[in-house]
């Protein structure tokens, strides 16, 4: 017992030490220890998630985009451009049967790239780079800026201020364009190469890459949502950007921002939409509080790097634009620099502009990313002084969702009937429009399908989101870039893996590259009558946008390619292949082979045995490894599957009567029989010569007494001269196996064992 300073023991007023008081203090001490341990565990989890985010940033794909590689004869091939911290890659994805890398350079960080088209007057005399084409514009990292921070370990972060022109023919750099300001995007056509900076656009001649003219724009808004796709679009003849309204233009000004669904009284759908918007806003506000708390902690252990498409580089022009110029879009002619039209597309600053292949449809998006507007550009041809008509038309309002997101990618189909919009949340939204639509009022459209690239949820997702927010990314965003493009397959090709060609194969496919480094091919087809639960699965409530997916178009995954997983990026280039896809050998290291994603029907998933019962063709083993590796635990702790109370149970699927009677009907999981997979340990013994030793008889006797659960699905593997080994890991001798009673099909009968023997087993 502890004593006071004078040597006396602490006592209660009546002279007796209170035993309950000591118990209370002990309980309080234990409670504080538990709270402290839990807090330290949370802190270690946050630090681990933050550190893993920094370490994986070096190997991940920082930027990705699909583009067209133009050949000398004018034909084009579809390529995938990947930017890494160590360099860049160019993949040929025109033929999905022969996806391979054609360029792999590792000479410095690449932020984003753009294939340069051949100029209109391409020739030996007019084209300065005639012998070096095709060309690739690479924005490099050879200039750096100091990021101001209170942290003592703040680092210099590279920013792209130079455009390096890379020749795919000679595999070398042939030209360099240097700028003083930060570069945000590069767009080109057969006439010019436009480089977007903080407050201006420099236009270069496509043949000589010499400075042609400059356009003053609105300042790039570099908030927490970043820049995204970029407020610059270059079509075959026109260039679109965000700038101040030009007073000399007689173009009409588009001022309507809120479009009513109908002129009559508000409907139930509109009321539900408004209520969902308020609910989503409240949930977002509650979530921001938790993110801010974790972000404050994670910011102490994370640097502040630039992440392409998510975090703005440097500081743009500090000049604040007037309210009238915010959200203003100006379309000019590339040749004569005249204004075609100008209109106010959004109330917020513009973050994304994109033309379709014809150059007549223009897609706009703001920094919030809630709605995407589609306009038709209609230039006036008449030179008379009569009253001019409107030079543009607002056709559609594509509703992405209520939450803020960065628009990273916009893609049109050949006929411009389909539009895919990729956001920083890892979701590709597919919209269907009618380009020939007539009318004055824009039509609100919801996504007919959404393709999610996957993100973490729960506590791990919260910690990862806070770590990403501390690194400068948007809360809830996925590191990297989501990009997509349309491809068109022939019905006679081998791209159909999951059904008959007449019913399932579609000419229109979609290639989607996810931040994880995988490219997936999806088949687009209309829903057929009578497909049952597959049609119902396409209709549901989207938790991200709060909108209901209509499910008019089925999006089925066909194949998947892993571009960077389990391979060295420095050893993937094939020296025998050319830039146009020829010469690639079958066993070339530069080629990646797809993983077939096949959707089995009910009839294919079940096979009828000789006795009339049904069972799954291939015995699938489900493991918890993929779920467990996402959790952060101490090395001294046991994994989840190794704990004493954890059990593996196998589903005994023997439902022949239901399958034969109902086909694809639902079944209750409570009615499915299960069988526990028992685990037990034994001492390691040598295999060779062990059964002939004197101790072998004792082990054999112990094996006879040990329980076994051999059934029809348990396979028996024969050991050469030493007995058999079952799936449960118990080794039996040949004499023991022959002495066991065997039924008509040659399968050993299951033996009964007592409860005492069960208690001796080790979990």
Swiss-Prot record:
Protein location: Preautophagosomal structure membrane; Vacuole membrane
Membrane topology: Peripheral membrane protein
Record flagged with keyword Repeat: yes
Pfam families membership: BCAS3, BCAS3_WD40
Keywords, in A-Z order: Autophagy, Membrane, Protein transport, Repeat, Transport, Vacuole, WD repeat
Lineage top rank: taxon: Eukaryota
Region spans: Disordered: 701-763
WD repeats mapped onto the chain: 345-385, 402-441
Gene Ontology biological-process annotations: autophagy; protein transport; response to starvation
Compositionally biased spans, kind Basic and acidic residues: 712-725, 741-754
Tissue: Expressed in roots, flowers and leaves.
SUPFAM superfamilies attached to this UniProt entry: WD40 repeat-like (SSF50978)
Annotated GO CC locations: phagophore assembly site membrane; vacuolar membrane
Record's compositionally biased regions (Polar residues): 701-711
Induction behaviour: By sucrose and nitrogen starvation.
Role summary: The PI(3,5)P2 regulatory complex regulates both the synthesis and turnover of phosphatidylinositol 3,5-bisphosphate (PtdIns(3,5)P2). Required for autophagy.
Family the entry assigns: Belongs to the WD repeat PROPPIN family.
Entry note about domains: The first protein part may form a beta-propeller domain involved in specific binding to phosphatidylinositol 3,5-bisphosphate (PIP2), leading to the association of the protein to the membrane.
PANTHER family listed in its UniProt record: AUTOPHAGY-RELATED PROTEIN 18F, BREAST CARCINOMA AMPLIFIED SEQUENCE 3
Quaternary structure (record): Component of the PI(3,5)P2 regulatory complex at least composed of ATG18, SAC/FIG4, FAB1 and VAC14.
Name by which UniProt lists this protein: Autophagy-related protein 18f
């Amino acid at each position: 017992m502890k004593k006071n300073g004078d040597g006396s023991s602490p006592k209660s007023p009546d002279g007796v030490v209170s035993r309950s008081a000591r118990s209370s203090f002990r309980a309080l001490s234990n409670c504080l220890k538990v709270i402290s341990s839990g807090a330290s565990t949370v802190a270690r989890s946050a630090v681990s998630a933050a550190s893993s985010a920094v370490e994986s940033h070096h190997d991940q794909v920082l930027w990705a985009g699909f583009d067209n590689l133009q050949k000398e004869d004018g034909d084009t091939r579809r390529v995938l451009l990947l930017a890494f911290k160590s360099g860049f890659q160019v993949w040929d994805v025109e033929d999905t049967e022969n996806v391979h890398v054609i360029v792999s350079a590792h000479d410095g960080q690449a932020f984003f790239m753009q294939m340069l088209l051949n100029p209109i007057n391409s020739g030996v005399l007019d084209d300065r780079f005639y012998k070096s084409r095709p060309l690739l514009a690479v924005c490099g990292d050879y200039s750096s800026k100091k990021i101001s921070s209170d942290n003592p370990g703040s680092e210099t972060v590279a920013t792209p201020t130079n455009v390096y022109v890379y020749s795919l023919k000679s595999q070398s750099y042939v030209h360099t364009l240097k700028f003083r300001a930060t570069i945000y995007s590069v767009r080109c056509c057969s006439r010019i190469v436009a480089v977007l900076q903080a407050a201006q656009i420099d236009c270069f001649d496509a043949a000589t890459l010499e400075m042609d003219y400059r356009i003053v724009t609105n300042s790039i808004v570099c908030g927490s949502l970043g820049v995204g796709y970029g407020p610059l679009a270059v079509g075959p003849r026109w260039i679109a950007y965000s700038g101040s309204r030009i007073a000399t233009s007689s173009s009409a000004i588009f001022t309507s921002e809120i479009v009513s669904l109908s002129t009559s009284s508000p409907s139930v759908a509109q009321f539900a939409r408004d209520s969902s918007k308020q609910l989503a806003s409240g949930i977002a506000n509650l979530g921001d509080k938790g993110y801010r708390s974790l972000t404050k902690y994670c910011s102490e252990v994370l640097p502040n790097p630039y992440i392409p498409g998510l975090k703005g580089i440097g500081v743009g022009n500090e000049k604040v634009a007037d309210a009238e110029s915010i959200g203003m879009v100006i379309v000019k002619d590339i040749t004569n620099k005249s204004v075609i039209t100008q209109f106010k597309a959004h109330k917020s600053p513009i973050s994304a502009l994109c033309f379709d292949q014809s150059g007549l449809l223009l897609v706009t998006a703001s920094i919030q990313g809630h709605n995407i507007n589609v306009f038709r550009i209609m230039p006036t041809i008449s030179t008379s002084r009569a009253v001019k008509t409107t030079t543009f038309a607002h056709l559609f309002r594509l509703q992405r969702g209520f939450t803020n997101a960065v628009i990273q990618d916009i893609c049109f189909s050949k006929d411009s009937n389909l539009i895919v919009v990729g956001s920083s949340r890892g979701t590709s939204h597919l919209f269907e429009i009618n380009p020939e639509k007539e009318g004055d009022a824009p039509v609100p459209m919801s996504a007919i399908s959404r393709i999610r690239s996957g993100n973490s949820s729960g506590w791990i997702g919260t910690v990862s989101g806070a770590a990403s927010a501390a690194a400068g990314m948007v809360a809830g965003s996925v590191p990297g870039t989501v990009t997509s493009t349309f491809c068109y397959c022939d019905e006679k090709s081998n791209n159909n893996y999951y059904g008959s060609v007449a019913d399932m194969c579609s000419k229109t496919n979609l290639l989607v590259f996810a931040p994880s480094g995988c490219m997936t091919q999806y088949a687009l087809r209309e829903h057929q009558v009578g497909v049952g639960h597959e049609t119902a699965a396409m209709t549901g409530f989207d938790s991200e946008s709060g909108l209901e997916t209509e499910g008019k178009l089925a999006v089925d995954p066909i194949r998947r390619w892993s571009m960077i997983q389990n391979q060295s990026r420095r050893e993937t280039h094939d020296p025998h292949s050319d830039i146009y896809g020829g010469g690639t050998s079958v066993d070339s290291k530069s080629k990646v082979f797809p993983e077939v994603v096949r959707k089995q029907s009910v009839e294919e998933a079940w096979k009828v045995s000789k006795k009339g019962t049904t069972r799954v063709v291939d015995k699938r083993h489900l493991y918890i490894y993929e779920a467990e590796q996402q959790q952060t635990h101490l090395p001294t702790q046991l994994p989840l599957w190794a704990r004493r109370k954890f059990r593996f149970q196998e589903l005994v699927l023997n439902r022949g009567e239901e399958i034969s009677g109902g086909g694809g009907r639902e079944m209750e999981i409570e009615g499915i029989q299960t069988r526990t997979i028992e685990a037990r340990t034994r001492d390691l013994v040598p295999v060779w010569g062990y059964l002939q030793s004197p101790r072998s008889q004792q082990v054999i006797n112990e094996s006879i007494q040990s329980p076994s659960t051999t059934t029809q699905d348990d396979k028996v593997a024969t050991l050469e001269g030493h007995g058999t080994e079952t799936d449960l890991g118990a080794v039996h001798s040949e004499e023991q196996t022959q002495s066991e009673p065997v039924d008509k099909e040659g399968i050993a009968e299951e033996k009964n064992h007592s409860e005492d023997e069960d208690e001796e087993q080790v979990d």
